[in-house]
Amino acid sequence: MVYTYLIIALTRIYFLCCKTILRQKEGYRLLKNFMDWLQNKILPPMSKVGNNKYLVSIRNGLVLTLPAIISGSVFLIVGNIPITAWANFIKPYMNMIGVAVNGSFGIISLLAAIGIGYELSKELGVDPISGAGLSTMAFVIVSFNDKFKLDTNNFSSSGLFTAIITAMISVTIFNFFIKKNIIIKLPDGVPTAVSNSFVSLLPGFVILVLFWFIRMPLHIDINLVIQSIFHPLLFAMNTLPGILVYTFLVSLLWVCGIHGDMTLEGIADPIFLQFLAANGTAFAHHQPLPYATAAGFSSLMVNVGGTGATITLVVLMLFSKSKTYRDLGRVAFPGALFEINEPVIFGFPIVMNPLTMIPFIVIPLILATGSYLLIHLGLMNAPVAMVPWTMPPIIGPLMATGWDWRAAVWSAVELVLAGAMYYPFFKVAEKGMLAKEKTSTD
């Protein structure tokens, strides 16, 4: 009940602030100055972060894990359809379904080592196949336990950060040897595949010795060390303040014209994917879900209909008095239905627009707060399965939470809330557009 009153209070404060800002030119001028500051001070460094070779490689390399996660999620969803007749029918086959779930979720770190090694090698201009192989070797070496047995538990979500670190170190060493020309060269007539294998021989041996020496003679559990280093970050991203900071940064970057989701994916995706894999495994074994902010939380429960919940803005445009907005709404609606909102962000526009900056940033914060609290209080499941981010509102949360009908109801409520919050700003924009249309007609 306290959380409910908190959300209501925040919403009232939001509308009061909106009313004050929209009625005063001074407030609008301050927003314009703030936008100029963002463009001059924040945009350049954040662009560099988004283009960092290592972060780009992590983002692109993790794509290799998605087929396994999505395929395993299909089995997870099918095996937990909340229909009594179906549950009775599928019960004898649940162990078989568990094999598919464990066999897909259980190797995401191994796939990440392969994918990141490949992508980083491409970014650095060295042979990607060799880079992927060396990264995988390093990750497997550090996955042996003190009893000299391979611990395949590290191949699951728990070893994801280890896979990332070992891949980056391995490819960096590989790149150093290649660029410094410390390699075994073969005659020009030798096939490329054979030549590349000999080129990677010396760096491969150094990588093997390095990780073997750390893991075996020194008895350092690299996976445990890395987990302890990243534990504060993992803890923070599963808290309400942590997810609010992330949500704020994504929206703020979009307002500045930077793809916020893509810029932060290299940092956030390993965390959210690890959360999702852990939730999926817990759900399959009928255990409590450990993480509220797993992959799907932001895309399906916060940014309904695209970042900023802009599908509601599109609906407002469809019924606008302005012909310009009606036409834009017709063009943007099909994409917005499937979470694609670039036509709105750049067409309305939202980018570098002081008027729409407030709702675009604040609405996701309110929706994130509501979603997190509902999950935290046990009133709605957290995401347990990976569904495509293009899944429409209501349907996407329903499937991602393992057919929790409460998630679908909350998604519908979110659409109403977002629409109500966009409405006053849209009416101001509509008034200005109608004046422009009248002037052009005259």
Describe the residue ranges of each PLM region.
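Alpha-helical membrane segments and immediately flanking helix-loop junctions
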Residues: 53, 108-120, 133-138, 285-355, ...
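Transmembrane alpha-helical segments and their short flanking loops
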Residues: 31-49, 280-289, 314, 331, ...
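Cytosolic juxtamembrane amphipathic/interface segments immediately preceding
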Residues: 39-61, 94, 187-195, 343-345
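Short juxtamembrane and helix-loop transition motifs at transmembrane-helix boundaries
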Residues: 87-99, 171, 223-230, 289-295, ...
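Hydrophobic core segments of alpha-helical transmembrane domains in multi-pass membrane transport
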Residues: 65-80, 111-119, 135-145, 164-175, ...
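Generic multipass alpha-helical transmembrane bundles of integral membrane proteins
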Residues: 205-320
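Early transmembrane hairpin of solute transport permeases
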Residues: 47-181, 351
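Membrane-interface helix-loop-helix junctions at boundaries between adjacent transmembrane segments
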Residues: 128, 144-241
